[in-house]
Amino acid sequence: MLHMSGEMTKAMENHASGCCINIGTLESIAVSILPEILTGYSDKHPKVSVQIENGPTFGPNGLVERVLGHSCDLAFISGDVEHPDIRKWVIGEDHVVIVTNKDCGETVDFKKLLQNQILSFPTGCVCRILYDRFAEHIGVKSKQVLESSSLSTIFSNVVAGMGVACFPKSCISFYKTRFPVYS
């Protein structure tokens, strides 16, 4: 979902030369759909400079707070936000999947699988919130969390057998051959 302050909407519509747009994004979006979006935008507006900041959707330094505080002009996030100072557009939908290393096998017992340590982005990550809700729904108490702000670090630790992770399916296509994906 794309969220933008009212001032930034006007600036993007005007496409002022020499303008700089500060984009906040989830790292999972940064590696999946953002490159294509930015390529199309840059082709149409080559004089506009783009800066990218990664972060979680929610929390004290989350992307929603950054847009409201005007430190980000717009943000690509997951989840829904209702706020009178934010305009939003749904730009796509994705499935959330659980990833684990290849040693897990073909058949999955989710109660057993979710007893593993979760590898996740810091608090405020929508996938982590959904993972915790799912674990609670099936009666599993979440174990220890290994947090990282790097998607590559999380995936590398999943491959090494340190635990499981929960991500949008679109962000893992590059890694798909390295471990099973369950949806």
Where are these regions (language model features)?
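Alpha-helical "hinge/linker" immediately C-terminal to small N-terminal DNA-binding modules
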Residues: 1-14
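Central regulatory/effector-binding core of bacterial HTH transcription factors
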Residues: 18-83
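Short, well-ordered beta-strand segments
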Residues: 22-25, 75, 99, 119, ...
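Hydrophobic residues within well-ordered alpha-helices
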Residues: 64-68, 113, 156-162
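Short beta-strand and adjacent tight-turn residues that come in two discontinuous sequence segments
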Residues: 72-78, 147-149, 166-168, 172
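Beta-alpha-beta core module
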Residues: 83-94, 153-183
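Flexible hinge/capping segments at coil-to-helix
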Residues: 83-123
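Secondary-structure junction motif
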Residues: 117-138
